[in-house]
């Protein structure tokens, strides 16, 4: 007889299957598979203190995080929805909008976020490259209160085209000090998140939020098949190279031939025989010469 836990597990599995079969418009943004399994992230929306959909409208993601409309609209930079025509890999279908819109600027730009309480926080930056199709086309830095927390970000080089990429930056605020990535600075109540103009095109961001907690509390993107395969191939290549090196070394050892014998370790009697022969020939010859 099945226990209560087995019946409950079967019911949840059937509900997930049913939700997957329903079109997104019917099941709504809050009823995705992540919503069924949302018990693990039940407190996530409450821990998020600030969230913005850069270049886009307000949106509530599958985890319940409420992204507000971009406060820089009409003030700084330009909004773009160029990515709306593209599907975004690694993202939940309901949340692709967070990566399809963006804000960029021809100069350094950023956001100010007031922080009232001390504690541990995490800054999550969301990106997707929807325009360029090769690396070294858009490269920029990200600064947090003057600290460079992301250096030379090349989104395409990291994950490829139209693929979600999150930068997760933990920090702590205590006793008037901001600590991030091993650096400390004076904190005056506001976080300044800057996207720094570099040599390659313009800086941008798709969405971002700040939450109280640690990196372990941040929802992760879906796995990237291309990156996983590449990592596996690199591991196999390193293993093969090591094996080949070992085999080659052994092969070279065989080809080098047997060890050269030590001449000092051989028997000295083998050297005495030619000496005795020479001495035996020399004495009679000398005797004959003396009689002449």
Swiss-Prot record:
<dbReference type="GO" id="GO:0005886">
    <property type="term" value="C:plasma membrane"/>
</dbReference>
<keyword id="KW-0472">Membrane</keyword>
<feature type="compositionally biased region" description="Acidic residues">
    <location>
        <begin position="231"/>
        <end position="241"/>
    </location>
</feature>
<feature type="compositionally biased region" description="Polar residues">
    <location>
        <begin position="245"/>
        <end position="265"/>
    </location>
</feature>
<comment type="similarity">
    <text>Belongs to the malectin family.</text>
</comment>
<keyword id="KW-0256">Endoplasmic reticulum</keyword>
<keyword id="KW-0732">Signal</keyword>
<keyword id="KW-1133">Transmembrane helix</keyword>
<dbReference type="InterPro" id="IPR021720">
    <property type="entry name" value="Malectin_dom"/>
</dbReference>
<keyword id="KW-0119">Carbohydrate metabolism</keyword>
<feature type="region of interest" description="Disordered">
    <location>
        <begin position="221"/>
        <end position="265"/>
    </location>
</feature>
<feature type="topological domain" description="Cytoplasmic">
    <location>
        <begin position="291"/>
        <end position="292"/>
    </location>
</feature>
<dbReference type="GO" id="GO:0016020">
    <property type="term" value="C:membrane"/>
</dbReference>
<feature type="binding site">
    <location>
        <position position="82"/>
    </location>
    <ligand>
        <name>a carbohydrate</name>
    </ligand>
</feature>
<feature type="signal peptide">
    <location>
        <begin position="1"/>
        <end position="28"/>
    </location>
</feature>
<feature type="binding site">
    <location>
        <position position="131"/>
    </location>
    <ligand>
        <name>a carbohydrate</name>
    </ligand>
</feature>
<dbReference type="InterPro" id="IPR039155">
    <property type="entry name" value="MLEC"/>
</dbReference>
<feature type="binding site">
    <location>
        <position position="104"/>
    </location>
    <ligand>
        <name>a carbohydrate</name>
    </ligand>
</feature>
<feature type="topological domain" description="Lumenal">
    <location>
        <begin position="29"/>
        <end position="269"/>
    </location>
</feature>
<keyword id="KW-0812">Transmembrane</keyword>
<feature type="binding site">
    <location>
        <position position="132"/>
    </location>
    <ligand>
        <name>a carbohydrate</name>
    </ligand>
</feature>
<dbReference type="GO" id="GO:0030246">
    <property type="term" value="F:carbohydrate binding"/>
</dbReference>
<dbReference type="GO" id="GO:0005789">
    <property type="term" value="C:endoplasmic reticulum membrane"/>
</dbReference>
<dbReference type="GO" id="GO:0008250">
    <property type="term" value="C:oligosaccharyltransferase complex"/>
</dbReference>
<feature type="glycosylation site" description="N-linked (GlcNAc...) asparagine">
    <location>
        <position position="268"/>
    </location>
</feature>
<dbReference type="GO" id="GO:0019899">
    <property type="term" value="F:enzyme binding"/>
</dbReference>
<comment type="function">
    <text>Carbohydrate-binding protein with a strong ligand preference for Glc2-N-glycan. May play a role in the early steps of protein N-glycosylation.</text>
</comment>
<protein>
    <recommendedName>
        <fullName>Malectin</fullName>
    </recommendedName>
</protein>
<dbReference type="Pfam" id="PF11721">
    <property type="entry name" value="Malectin"/>
</dbReference>
<dbReference type="GO" id="GO:0005783">
    <property type="term" value="C:endoplasmic reticulum"/>
</dbReference>
<dbReference type="GO" id="GO:0035579">
    <property type="term" value="C:specific granule membrane"/>
</dbReference>
<feature type="binding site">
    <location>
        <position position="201"/>
    </location>
    <ligand>
        <name>a carbohydrate</name>
    </ligand>
</feature>
<keyword id="KW-0325">Glycoprotein</keyword>
<comment type="subunit">
    <text>Interacts with the oligosaccharyltransferase (OST) complex.</text>
</comment>
<feature type="transmembrane region" description="Helical">
    <location>
        <begin position="270"/>
        <end position="290"/>
    </location>
</feature>
């Amino acid at each position: 007889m099945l226990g209560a836990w087995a019946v409950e597990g079967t019911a949840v599995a059937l509900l997930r299957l049913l939700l997957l079969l329903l079109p997104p418009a019917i099941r709504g943004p809050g009823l995705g598979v992540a919503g069924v399994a949302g018990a693990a992230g039940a407190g996530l929306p409450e821990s998020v203190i600030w969230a913005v959909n850069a270049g886009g409208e307000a949106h509530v993601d599958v985890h319940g995080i409420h992204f507000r409309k971009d406060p820089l609209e009409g003030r700084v930079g330009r909004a773009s929805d160029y990515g709306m025509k593209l599907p975004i890999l690694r993202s939940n279908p309901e949340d692709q909008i967070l990566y399809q819109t963006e804000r960029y600027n021809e100069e350094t730009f950023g956001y100010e976020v007031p922080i009232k309480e001390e504690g541990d926080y995490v800054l999550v930056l969301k990106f997707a490259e929807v325009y360029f199709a090769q690396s070294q086309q858009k490269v920029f830095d990200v600064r947090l209160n003057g600290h460079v927390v992301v250096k030379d970000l090349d989104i395409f080089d990291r994950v490829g085209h139209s693929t979600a990429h999150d930068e997760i930056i933990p920090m702590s605020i205590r006793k008037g000090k901001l600590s991030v990535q091993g650096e400390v600075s004076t904190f005056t109540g506001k976080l300044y998140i800057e996207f720094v103009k570099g040599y390659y095109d313009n800086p941008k961001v798709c969405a971002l939020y700040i939450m109280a907690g640690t990196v372990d509390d941040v929802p992760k993107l879906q796995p990237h098949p291309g990156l996983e395969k590449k990592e596996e191939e690199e591991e196999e290549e390193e293993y093969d190279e090591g094996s080949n090196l070992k085999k080659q070394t052994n092969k070279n050892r065989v080809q080098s031939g047997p060890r050269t014998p030590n001449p000092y370790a051989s028997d000295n009697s083998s050297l005495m025989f030619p000496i005795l022969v020479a001495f035996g020939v020399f004495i009679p010859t000398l005797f004959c010469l003396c009689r002449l």
